[in-house]
Amino acid sequence: MKFPTLLIAAGLLCISVHTTAQPGPRKKVGVVLSGGGAKGMAHIGALKVIEEAGIPIDYVVGTSMGSIIGGLYSIGYTPEQMDSMVRRQDWSFLLSDKIPRSEQNMAEREASEKYVFSLPFGKNAKTQAVGGLIKGQNLANLFSELTVGYHDSIDFNKLPIPFACVSENIVNGNEVNFHKGVLATAMRASMAIPGVFTPVRLGSM
């Protein structure tokens, strides 16, 4: 990434604020947000601390949970708004493939009450390979709702705060850097943990 930045790794933050004026142009500040599942929520608090310290953020880079927090921050969500959003979500529903009860027919409602989760079966009762236990459609829907206004394919450098996120091509193991595209899709691809969430198919990948 060609960011002339001072990188701050959230979660391993050591902030030193100098009040003495420095000669020359201000150094660019970039925030790197790692993964870590639920622990990734700590990134929200880290962003709040950085803001309260008066440190301007010029770039945001994230992976997995960090890509979600970073992506939302890059389009204007404040740490307070993200904290409130996280607290009011039904995570047991989001981290499943359950259809909202209001959209289920009678058979689907009965099945959802009987089973915690299900796997697709093919011929001879063999489970079909799905790439992960969770398709993540409910999360994808949430990301789409939260990124209204940014559904087109865009250059992430042109977001209110330039953003990038990282994923992996499960076919060849190569790193995939997202600097453009559909923001919600990039966030979903970055959090596609092999064996847990099904991968996101993008173009020829």
What are these language model-derived features?
Residues 20-63, 71-205:
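Patatin-like phospholipase
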